[in-house]
């Protein structure tokens, strides 16, 4: 994971979300601190789910899902200086998340994904378009994003894309290709 993050940074990536659903809090914190040390301040680091570990590791923000702490509680923990992102999977969730003080909202899965054990229903490009109509906040599209479909997702209204599987096995090369495709 650390080597991949270093390659992503070398490929021009400026924001990485650290997501570890299986590791113990101690392991996650150790990895997160090493990630921060290794990348310095050249890359914004977002902690998945855990506001406490975000603060302890010196990350730039927290991303929460629908089953995590409510955004208002997370904001009380992290303060106003750090970023807060919220995952949404349908128009109702997006409308509620839009009323929070999150800096950005994620919408997805846009396409079928293998990165989650039990993913929510696919929203498709139409889901991204609808989300764009419902919020003025930056939208991050997630779920099944590849170099082949990233441009269409941005054209549908996403400000950014979140990618896991299509960055491997060559993170630097893949990141550079994403930047070339997205301009």
Predicted feature locations:
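Glycine/threonine-rich flexible loop motifs
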Residues: 115-117
């Amino acid at each position: 994971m650390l080597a991949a993050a270093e390659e992503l940074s070398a490929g021009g990536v400026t924001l990485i979300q650290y997501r570890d659903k299986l590791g113990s809090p101690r392991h996650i914190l150790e990895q997160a601190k090493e990630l921060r040390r290794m990348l310095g301040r050249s890359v914004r680091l977002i902690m998945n789910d855990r506001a406490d570990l975000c603060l302890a590791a010196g990350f730039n923000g927290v991303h929460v899902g629908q089953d995590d702490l409510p955004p208002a509680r997370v904001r009380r923990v992290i303060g106003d200086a750090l970023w807060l992102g919220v995952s949404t999977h349908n128009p109702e969730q997006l409308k509620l998340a839009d009323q929070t003080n999150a800096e950005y909202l994620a919408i997805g899965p846009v396409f079928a994904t293998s990165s989650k054990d039990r993913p929510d229903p696919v929203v498709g490009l139409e889901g991204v378009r609808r989300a764009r109509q419902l919020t003025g906040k930056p939208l991050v599209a997630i779920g099944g994003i590849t170099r082949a479909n990233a441009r269409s997702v941005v054209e549908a209204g996403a400000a950014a894309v979140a990618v896991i599987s299509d960055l491997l096995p060559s993170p630097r090369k893949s990141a550079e290709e994403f930047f070339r495709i997205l301009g």
